């Protein structure tokens, strides 16, 4: 998918390759079902994972935009080590534009986040008031250090809001957690806290390696959004857009339940209906037959609790949605809290990412088959086909490897018991090695290009090398030895 210059997940009007019915299928004065789509599995994918059939994506939207009320906005500005140089300047530009576009009735506060969340002011106030001026001065004095503990920061941020009925919003500016990621139990607890206190989190992705899947999952679970500036450094435009999106009205459904027609069994991922907005879908993955199923929940409307019931229509079947089976398969263990399906574009980006994984796995399967490891080749090819049934390389390799595995003589018994590893973990480790090797090659090319550039534009050469250095330092796929070697080479050139 080609990246737009300013990506908003999912507000840009983008025409996707799959068919999306434009009319709402089931409506209520509060919410409506905007689309229901199902994965049409190719035989190759069905053979690779027979349990993945019957996965539907369902889009739910608030029926109409409610009037946005005066809001309290806490800006979490990432001051970790990744936010240096141009990234720091872009973040400051975006923050300045966000504050300049603030509405008169909104109140703002600023906090820094790295290994912990540190408030930079005493209270919420006008976007360009004296309290914010002092907070911005404190921010300018902070040196980017450490990593980003986003979960801990969000829990601290939730405590900074005063009691009352004003809408609460967190705007995070940064690239998200680094190589360590977040623990599922801790992330789930943070989401529970944010939801209980009705705090929507909108993120502005700025940094060398934006963890967009996690930031998208955070926005999906809390009724927020995600904006990622393009390569043209449009930080100010992104800041203005982020500020506008962050204060849009959010509906907080409670007691959500999914009832199947007849005796069919259904499972919803995530298991709780996310908050609803009128400017994007809240997307659910549903396992099982969805036609005539009933999605019910309650909302606060006009000072009273209002029940809502939406009947799901028959899904539109599309082969482009075959990735939904593997997406749901990967999400079951964590109850769907990490699903990055932030509206339709989030769904499309997720598909593109999984197709990329399928290509990597297909390459690994071909390498395994060339080395005579037929069983590994079959396993890797099937993992590729679960993500992208149209991957021809994986389909051919699987067919060839299965035939050769049958024809090959049985291997000799090992002299000692060999423990069997987890198949999925082996796949991920193999993918990690390939991506690490690719980064090593890319770094070597960048060093060579910088050497050629040195005689004509030494400042640009140094900047290119420092960008490569940041990427090597933060990339999760490099092993420690390769990382140390590459960093030493880059440091010597710099």
Where are these regions (language model features)?
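VWA/integrin I-like adhesion module and closely mimicked acidic/polar interface patches used
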Residues: 176-229, 237-240
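Bacterial N-terminal signal peptides
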Residues: 8-22
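Von Willebrand factor
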Residues: 66-126, 150-158, 166-174, 202-206, ...
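Alpha-helical, heptad-rich or low-complexity scaffold/stalk segments
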Residues: 351, 355-494
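Short beta-strand-loop
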Residues: 28-36, 107-138, 155-161, 180-185, ...
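Extracytoplasmic/secreted envelope proteins and their assembly/folding machinery
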Residues: 55-57, 88, 92-99, 129-136, ...
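Second-shell loop/turn segments in exported
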Residues: 76-87, 121-125, 138-146, 176-178, ...
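An acidic, Ser/Thr-enriched
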Residues: 29-46, 54-57, 64-74, 98, ...
């Amino acid at each position: 998918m080609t990246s737009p210059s300013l990506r908003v997940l999912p507000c840009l009007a983008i025409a996707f390759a799959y068919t999306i019915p434009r009319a709402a299928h089931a409506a209520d004065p509060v919410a409506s079902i905007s689309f229901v789509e199902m994965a049409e599995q190719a035989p190759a994918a069905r053979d690779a994972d027979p349990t993945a059939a019957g996965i539907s994506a369902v889009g739910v939207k608030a029926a109409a935009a409610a009037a946005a009320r005066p809001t309290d906005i806490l800006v979490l500005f990432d001051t970790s080590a990744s936010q240096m140089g141009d990234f720091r300047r872009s973040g400051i530009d975006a923050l300045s534009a966000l504050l300049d576009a603030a509405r008169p009735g909104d109140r703002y506060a600023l906090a820094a986040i790295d290994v912990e969340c540190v408030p930079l002011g005493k209270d919420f106030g006008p976007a360009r008031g004296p309290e914010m001026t002092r907070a911005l001065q404190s921010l300018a004095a902070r040196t980017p250090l450490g990593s980003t503990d986003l979960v801990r920061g969000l829990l601290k941020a939730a405590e900074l809001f005063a009691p009352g009925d004003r809408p609460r919003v967190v705007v995070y500016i940064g690239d998200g957690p680094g190589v360590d990621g977040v623990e599922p139990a801790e992330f789930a607890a943070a989401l529970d806290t944010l939801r209980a206190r009705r705090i929507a989190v909108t993120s502005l992705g700025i940094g060398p390696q934006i963890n967009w899947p996690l930031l998208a999952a955070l926005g999906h679970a809390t009724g927020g959004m995600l904006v990622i500036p393009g390569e043209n450094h449009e930080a100010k435009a992104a800041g203005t857009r982020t500020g506008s999106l962050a204060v849009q009205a959010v509906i907080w459904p409670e007691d959500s339940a999914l009832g199947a027609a007849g005796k069919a069994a259904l499972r919803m991922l995530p298991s709780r209906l996310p908050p609803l907005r009128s400017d994007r879908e809240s997307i659910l993955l549903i396992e099982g037959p969805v036609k005539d199923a009933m999605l019910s929940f309650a909302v606060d409307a006009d000072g009273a609790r209002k029940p809502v019931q939406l009947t799901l229509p028959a899904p539109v079947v599309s082969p482009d949605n075959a990735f939904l089976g593997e997406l749901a398969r990967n999400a079951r263990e964590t109850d769907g809290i990490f699903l990055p399906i932030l509206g339709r574009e989030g769904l499309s980006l997720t598909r593109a990412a999984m197709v990329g994984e399928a290509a990597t796995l297909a390459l690994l399967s071909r390498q395994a088959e060339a080395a005579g490891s037929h069983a590994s080749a079959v396993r890797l090819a099937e993992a590729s086909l679960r993500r992208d049934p149209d991957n021809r390389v994986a389909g051919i390799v699987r067919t060839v490897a299965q035939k050769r595995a049958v024809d090959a003589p049985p291997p000799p018994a090992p002299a000692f018991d060999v423990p069997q590893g987890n198949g999925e973990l082996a796949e991920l480790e193999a993918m990690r090695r390939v991506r690490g090797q690719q980064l090593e090659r890319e770094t070597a090319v960048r060093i060579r290009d910088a050497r050629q550039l040195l005689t004509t534009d030494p400042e640009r050469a140094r900047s290119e090398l420092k960008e490569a250095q940041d990427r090597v330092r933060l990339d999760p796929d490099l092993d420690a030895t390769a990382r140390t070697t590459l960093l030493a080479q880059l440091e010597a050139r710099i």
